Amino acid sequence: MHAPLVVLGGGPGGYAAAFMAADLGMEVTLVEKDTRLGGTCLLRGCIPSKALLHVGRVVAEAREMQDWGVHFPAPKIDIDAVRSRKEKVIGALTGGLAQLAKRRNVEVVQGQAIFTASNTIEVVQKDAGSQTFTFDHCILASGSRPARIPAFDIGSPRVMDSTAALQLEDVPDSLLVIGGGYIGLEMGTVYAELGSQVSVVELTDGLLPGADRDLVKPLHKRVKGLFEAIRLNTKVVGLKDVGNGVEVSFEGPDGETT
């Protein structure tokens, strides 16, 4: 099969490029290895995190209204219902992207693309063999994936990356977030508002490294009251699975602790 334009990757970069090219009159084939369009942002990043942060914010606002003399009972968290609602939000948006692709006559092919020549790809499909496409032009928008840190890869289901954390399989009694960047703080906030005792460890001397310090100060003040602890200038030097939890070794200004 021949495609004038092939776009590899159905995330925000890929589908936007495919839609614009189609609007300009090109025949477009969009290859995405996931079963749905949207990429990391929509499927396991920005959208699910903001959906869960909305839940956390509502819980926080109900609690903070006590200062105004308005009292609500402690919330009862139905984690299965929260997870289901998050997936419905994702499903609605991915369904919308599929309709937009259809309206523009963008051919969406599900599978993993492999270059076999300078203008040829083979798309390997999980249950349907493979297809070969030649093309005139190709846009690479293959995205990224979480980097795995070998020292933290101890084979324990208790150690999660952001993708696993967004699955919201359960809400642990306690949670350590390694990294005080925006992803770590988002996940920490969600789990803290849902009932976990959350601690954050950050290697540098402040949360959100690289962000404007005038913005970080009020944020730090807010999350300090939400989190169990915030350890700055602290490095995680080891993790150990101890059965009913994970033992963590820190190296900070006061030396090494466990």
Predicted feature descriptions by range:
Residues M1-A3, F19-V171, T204-L208, R213-K217, ...:
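Glycine-rich flavin
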Residues A3-L30, G184-E193:
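N-terminal Rossmann-like FAD-binding beta1-loop-alpha1 element of flavoenzymes
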Residues G9-P12, T35, I178-G181:
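Glycine-rich Rossmann-fold phosphate-binding loop(s) that bind the pyrophosphate
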Residues G14, T132-H137, G181, V190:
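Intrinsically disordered, low-complexity N-terminal regions enriched in serine/proline/glycine
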Residues E169-A211:
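Rossmann-like NAD(P)H-binding beta-loop-alpha module
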